[in-house]
A protein has these predicted regions:
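A detector for short, charged/polar N-terminal pre-domain segments
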Residues: 1-11, 67
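A basic, amphipathic helix-loop patch mediating RNA/tRNA/ribosome contacts
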Residues: 11-54
Length: 72
């Protein structure tokens, strides 16, 4: 499991997938999320705008990420 550090209160799920280079475009993120390929905290998530906050776990195609916060 890898750690993703954000400097904001949250990051949208589709933006997290792009930020971690799991997908290359927002369109691809939308497709993957709507195809039920992404889990958040162990549950399938189909909301691409879901707010991912520090402490959340995101998994996609065998990659697992935990989000943490760093003061700006």
């Amino acid at each position: 499991m890898e750690n993703v550090v954000i400097q904001t209160e949250f990051i949208k799920l589709q933006d997290l997938l792009k930020f971690t280079n799991l997908v290359s475009t927002g369109g691809e993120a939308k497709e993957r999320i709507q195809a039920c390929e992404v889990t958040v905290n162990g549950e399938v998530c189909t909301m691409r705008g879901k707010k991912i906050r520090p402490g959340d776990d995101v998994a996609f195609q065998g990659a697992h990420y935990t989000v943490s916060y760093a003061d700006p």
